[in-house]
A protein has these predicted regions:
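Structured alpha/beta reader/binder surfaces that contact nucleic acids or chromatin modification marks
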Residues: 2-114
Length: 114
């Protein structure tokens, strides 16, 4: 079975690798399910990391910051501006997928235990 895959902007790859970033917000990119996910640098497909998806929530973009406890870091305007880098048409009322995953290190442990 093909592993599910998403691309990531290059500047976010180090934060995923270090385990600092454990979620991603996606809009209209198809359904991601629990299990292994390959995150690929969108400018260099040899640069990829595998993480284990633990949760997928569908919610409005306007609800994401509160769900992640980041209301102060991500006021609506900041979140919307960041998301429009990737999705120019997105709105605060758009339904997005909030994908939560293990760190690459935790994922490796999980995959080697099975």
């Amino acid at each position: 079975m093909e592993m599910q895959q998403l691309t990531l902007v290059p500047r976010l790859m180090p934060a995923v690798r270090s385990g600092e970033k454990t979620s991603t917000i996606r809009w209209q990119e198809g359904d991601i399910t629990m299990g292994p996910l390959r995150l690929v640098n969108q400018q260099d497909d040899t640069d990829a990391v595998i993480v284990w998806v633990t949760q997928v929530d569908t919610l409005r973009l306007s609800e994401v910051a509160a769900t992640l406890g980041k209301q102060e870091e991500w006021p609506d305007e900041v979140l919307l501006e960041g998301m429009r880098e990737h999705y120019p048409e997105i709105r605060l009322s758009s339904e997005v997928q909030l994908i939560t995953h293990l760190t690459p290190a935790e994922t490796l442990q999980k995959l080697t235990k099975q």
